[in-house]
């Protein structure tokens, strides 16, 4: 049933993923501005990945040829994989915190004060803030749930792209 839906409406799937990303970003803003949780550098990178997936899937859901929605879908798939990687790294830091947990620089401080070649490794090394678990739902931290969401989006995109109808080769029709 789900695979039939994926076959019939790839643009609907892309629109649904875009809406889910926007909902997750809105929930992140709620946690930050209403609940008072400050995002760590890895959380901010995950937000950027969500924004990218939302934009690419949103563009893919608009009218256009098959090639366009497939292009946007592939880009969204790559960003979903990147977001899953960052969320997995943050989950690892939460499960196995570093010996010395310090509150490192904030994300924007790292980007502004260090060359990008030094800032990127610092972000992925994490800080004491990245290992902290400030909120849980059903036993999972925000990073755990973010990982699950990124993996589900990546799997849905992958299935959608793999099941996309292929154009006939060589000019022969199957009929």
Swiss-Prot record:
Name one process (GO BP) from the record: protein folding
Q: What are the TM regions of this chain, as residue ranges? A: 14-30, 49-65, 71-88, 145-163
Q: Does the keyword Mitochondrion apply?
A: no
Establish whether keyword Signal is in the entry. no
What's the main place this protein lives?
membrane
Question: Where can this protein be found?
Answer: Cell inner membrane
User: What keywords does the record list, in alphabetical order?
Assistant: Cell inner membrane, Cell membrane, Chaperone, Disulfide bond, Electron transport, Membrane, Oxidoreductase, Redox-active center, Transmembrane, Transmembrane helix, Transport
One example GO MF annotation: electron transfer activity
Cellular component per GO, a single term:
plasma membrane
User: Membrane side Cytoplasmic: which residues?
Assistant: 1-13, 66-70, 164-175
Annotated S-S bridges? 40-43, 103-130
Write down the membrane topology: Multi-pass membrane protein
Q: Which InterPro entries match?
A: DiS_bond_form_DsbB/BdbC, Disulphide_bond_form_DsbB, DsbB, DsbB-like_sf
Query: Organism's domain of life?
Result: Bacteria
Periplasmic-facing ranges: 31-48, 89-144
What the protein does comes down to:
Required for disulfide bond formation in some periplasmic proteins. Acts by oxidizing the DsbA protein.
Record-stated family: Belongs to the DsbB family.
Database matches in PANTHER family: DISULFIDE BOND FORMATION PROTEIN B
State what protein this is by name: Disulfide bond formation protein B
Give the species this sequence originates from. Paracidovorax citrulli (strain AAC00-1) (Acidovorax citrulli)
């Amino acid at each position: 049933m789900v695979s039939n839906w994926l076959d019939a409406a790839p643009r609907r799937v892309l629109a649904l993923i875009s809406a889910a990303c926007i909902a997750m970003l809105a929930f992140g803003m709620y946690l930050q501005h209403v609940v008072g949780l400050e995002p760590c550098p890895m959380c901010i990178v995950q937000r950027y990945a969500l924004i990218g997936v939302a934009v690419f899937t949103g563009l893919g859901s608009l009218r256009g040829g098959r090639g366009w929605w497939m292009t946007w879908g592939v880009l969204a798939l790559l960003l979903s994989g990147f977001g899953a990687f960052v969320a997995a790294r943050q989950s690892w830091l939460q499960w196995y915190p570093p010996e010395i947990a310090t509150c490192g620089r904030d994300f924007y401080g790292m980007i502004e004060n260090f060359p990008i070649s030094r800032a990127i490794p610092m972000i992925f090394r994490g800080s004491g803030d990245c290992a902290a678990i400030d909120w849980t739902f059903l036993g999972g931290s925000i990073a755990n749930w973010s990982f699950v969401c990124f993996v589900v989006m990546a799997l849905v995109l992958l299935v959608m792209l793999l099941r996309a109808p292929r154009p006939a080769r060589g000019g022969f029709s199957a009929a």
